[in-house]
């Protein structure tokens, strides 16, 4: 059995002469996202309004501010991942030497020519004037770099943040296209975790750091082809990710707050974006019945340990029709979790969080095509025991950094 499903999926896709490792060609394409968006009411948001930034600023009190500073590095594996992701922060578009990325200048071989990350080639490369061919090529390149799913859209103006999070300066981004890169958080681990134990943050930062790594390389590659490009990842965004995922055909908005759910990965992924002026053919939004499914399911709302997710109907909020979520409660739970590192219970229990097996592909197809089957899908999910942790194959160590020392937490399942 191939442990890495991406490799298996790519092999199957190549045998069918398809680009994508999942059967995205079977999805229903529509002209508009299934989430109603009133563009007249949507405004460009300041990234400093995010729950995590406000926690770090002290808006939720001194204790939460202190926990914000340690909620990722308090677990050694997620700490290592965020350290690596932090090295990518300056590699999005600005000219940066290797030393600034964390590698001492003395470690760079003298016989190698390291082009500045932000430099755009003076001449446009051959073959880059055909949008259809370049879209296919860019997707294939992203998959070669180990992406799990890729989509392309025109960059919505309202997806661009108004100001930088770091210094509050206005953002001026005029790229035409956005390339979205999804990375699976690993079904093998997701099956075993409770969703809010000690591996939770590491699953997130596995996908954050990997998608960011790919985005930085892809953006640099596009610049070498003669077109401006910027990577956007967890350590350095200039765009909001959800609207881009909607327009790039990578999912629909779900009940879990501002999360986009993919029909093949469920909510079990993180994304990075590359914006560019390279001419690209775009994808269209998709409709796989998720709005109807989430209206009936409500499992994430029932299981949410902080009560952040609503079981009520949708509301219009900042121009989007969406299910409401209490961002403050969610942020406090993820940062202040005393039983683990972070929280992803909503991802864990979601009926769309499944492996890519023939059985589960069949169930997914049925729920996409037959509305009456969706309620039975939720019932069957509970009947088969999905959403519960399987510690029989648990591989990670339960450890917590307290005052600089690694200790076994009281909530450890290692005992």
Task: Enumerate the language-model features and the residues they cover.
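Low-complexity, intrinsically disordered regions enriched in charged/polar residues
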Residues: 75, 82, 244, 360, ...
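Non-catalytic, usually N-terminal nucleic-acid engagement modules in DNA/RNA processing proteins
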Residues: 1-190, 195-197
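Intrinsic-disorder/low-complexity, polar/charged segments
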Residues: 130, 134, 209, 213-214, ...
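Flanking helices and flexible, charged tails adjoining ferredoxin-like Fe-S electron-transfer domains
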Residues: 2-32, 312-415
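Catalytic cores of enzyme domains
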Residues: 139, 144-356, 360-367
């Amino acid at each position: 059995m191939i442990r890495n499903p991406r490799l298996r999926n790519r092999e199957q896709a190549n045998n069918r002469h398809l680009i994508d490792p999942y059967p995205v060609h079977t999805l229903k394409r529509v002209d508009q996202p299934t989430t109603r968006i009133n563009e007249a009411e949507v405004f460009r948001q300041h990234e400093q309004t995010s729950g995590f930034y406000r926690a770090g600023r002290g808006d939720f009190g001194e204790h939460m501010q202190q926990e914000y500073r340690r909620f990722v590095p308090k677990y050694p594996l997620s700490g290592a991942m965020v350290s690596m992701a932090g090295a990518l922060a300056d590699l999005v578009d600005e000219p940066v030497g290797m030393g600034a990325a964390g590698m001492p200048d003395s470690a760079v071989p003298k016989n190698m020519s390291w082009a500045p990350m932000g430099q755009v080639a003076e001449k446009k490369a051959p073959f880059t004037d055909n949008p259809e061919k370049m879209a296919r090529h860019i997707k294939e390149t992203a998959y070669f770099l180990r992406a799990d799913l890729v989509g392309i859209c025109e960059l919505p103006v309202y997806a661009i943040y108004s100001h930088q999070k770091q210094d509050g300066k206005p953002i001026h981004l005029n790229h035409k296209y956005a390339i979205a890169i999804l990375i699976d958080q690993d079904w093998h681990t997701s099956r075993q975790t409770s969703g809010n134990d000690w591996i939770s943050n590491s699953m997130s930062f596995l996908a954050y750091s990997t998608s960011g790594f790919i985005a930085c390389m892809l953006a640099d590659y596009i610049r070498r082809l003669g077109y401006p490009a910027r990577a956007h990842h967890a350590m350095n965004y200039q765009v909001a990710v959800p609207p881009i995922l909607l327009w790039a055909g990578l999912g629909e908005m779900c009940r879990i707050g501002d999360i986009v759910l993919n029909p093949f990965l469920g909510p079990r992924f993180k994304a990075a974006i590359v914006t560019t002026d390279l001419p690209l053919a775009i994808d269209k939004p998709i409709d796989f019945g998720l709005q109807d499914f989430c209206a009936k399911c409500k499992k994430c709302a029932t299981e949410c340990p902080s009560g952040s997710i609503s079981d009520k109907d949708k509301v219009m909020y900042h121009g989007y029709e969406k299910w409401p979520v209490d961002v403050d409660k969610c942020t406090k739970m993820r940062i202040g979790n005393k039983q683990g590192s972070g929280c992803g219970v909503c991802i864990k229990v979601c009926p769309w969080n499944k492996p890519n097996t023939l059985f589960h592909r069949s169930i997914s197809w049925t729920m996409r095509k037959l509305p009456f089957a969706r309620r039975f899908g939720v019932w069957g999910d509970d009947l088969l025991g999905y959403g519960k942790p399987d510690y029989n194959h648990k591989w990670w160590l339960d450890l917590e950094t307290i005052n600089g020392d690694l200790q076994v937490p009281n909530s450890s399942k290692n005992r």
